[in-house]
Amino acid sequence: MASRIVQQQQARGEAVVGGGKQQKKNGVADGRNRKALGDIGNLANVRGVVDAKPNRPITRSFGAQLLANAQAAAAADNSKRQACANVAGPPAVANEGVAVAKRAAPKPVSKKVIVKPKPSEKVTDIDASPDKKEVLKDKKKEGDANPKKKSQHTLTSVLTARSKAACGITNKPKEQIIDIDASDVDNELAAVEYIDDIYKFYKLVENESRPHDYIGSQPEINERMRAILVDWLIDVHTKFELSLETLYLTINIIDRFLAVKTVPRRELQLVGISAMLMASKYEEIWPPEVNDFVCLSDRAYTHEHILTMEKTILNKLEWTLTVPTPLVFLVRFIKASVPDQELDNMAHFLSELGMMNYATLMYCPSMVAASAVLAARCTLNKAPFWNETLKLHTGYSQEQLMDCARLLVGFYSTLENGKLRVVYRKYSDPQKGAVAVLPPAKFLLPEGSASQHS
């Protein structure tokens, strides 16, 4: 047998000595394929670089020269194109098929090198791979497809704005609502936490205790007699120095009782006395005694008459005396108006005028109170006459209150020449600001009524 020739493996970078047979290229030996390992510098081919057969064996010095040339070419290409490039080279193969690393300097950790852009240039990512560049292009397309919306004035908006300006319609800023309870936060008696719920409840139940139109069912009583009785009771209330709550509750009791019971004319004053006695017991700390009312009536009624009528009224009203009167709402609405003392006196003056006249029974207590505030602001020329704060707390707009406000101003304009002058004298006092002597807001009245009263 022929002896087997053992060929020594060629050392890296050395030529074959002895003229042995050359092995296959690209590292193919003994019919086996060997993959280039990534951790020894053998990287994938760069696009556009064609493998070429070396003309001579690659020694270490020759490999260093090739490496320097490759680095210079890559640097020149990067400076011209300003693009990302992979500087790794393909593996070089010796004549005997041993792979030799044709590579640049050891590959550094992948970092993004940002070139400071000029005003007309864009930032380029030098280390971006082709796949990464495609991703960046896709993101750029998405960004171009969804640009940030900029506020631009279209032709339609410009024309609309000009039309509004020509018609006198402008977008006025919304009026701020004043917190009327801010000053009472530390006042436990003000019950700021519950005040809104309390007045919502009052608005819900105010119609339950509201008397209906009863004059038609009273054969011996008319509106004039009722006005005389209320005028006299206001005088008695002033002499006894009772609270306003007592006065308003007295009138409420009278109207509710007359709505369910027919009363002869001779007992009308007795009903008023008994109603004030009950209201005084309910509201006052030191109410007047029964004998005081006997003396006020010039002994027209006895002690027993007053107590008997008191029981009759309580039975008819089913002992219900806790009701929302116009005063309950008036106090709140005056506070919402941010008033001075003059406005406070004027609103109370107009409210008592309304209480004295039967025609105001057609309106609920909250509307009478709100209309008194509106009429007072108009009389004193407090601009604006109505605002968002008043609208919020009253629940009424200015248009909804105009009919009732005109009614109150009408009573005011005829008061000076009328015979029932107790309210006029009361609010002509300097302690009340003498608001009764001020001219009424006749511009609220219809033209015919204004000329008639003037």
Curated annotation (Swiss-Prot):
An example Pfam family from this entry, by short name, is Cyclin_C
Regions of compositional bias (Polar residues) in chain numbering: 1-11
Bridged cysteine pairs (disulfide): none
Q: What is a biological process (GO) this protein takes part in? A: cell division
Q: Which UniProt keywords apply?
A: Cell cycle, Cell division, Cyclin, Mitosis
Basic and acidic residues compositional bias, start-end: 118-147
Stored InterPro entries:
Cyclin, Cyclin-like_dom, Cyclin-like_sf, Cyclin_A/B-like, Cyclin_C-dom, Cyclin_N, Cyclins_cyclin-box
Q: Does the keyword Acetylation apply?
A: no
Summarizing the function annotation, the protein's role is: Essential for the control of the cell cycle at the G2/M (mitosis) transition.
GO terms for MF: cyclin-dependent protein serine/threonine kinase regulator activity
Q: Which family does it belong to?
A: Belongs to the cyclin family. Cyclin AB subfamily.
Mind telling me which GO cellular component terms the entry cites? cyclin-dependent protein kinase holoenzyme complex; cytoplasm; nucleus
Stated name of the protein: G2/mitotic-specific cyclin S13-6
Quaternary state and partners of this protein?
Interacts with the CDC2 protein kinase to form a serine/threonine kinase holoenzyme complex also known as maturation promoting factor (MPF). The cyclin subunit imparts substrate specificity to the complex.
Give yes or no: UniProt keyword Cell division.
yes
List the PROSITE patterns: CYCLINS (PS00292)
Annotated region Disordered: the residues are 1-35, 108-155
Recorded hits in Gene3D superfamilies, A to Z, give: Cyclin-like
Give the source's domain of life in one word. Answer: Eukaryota
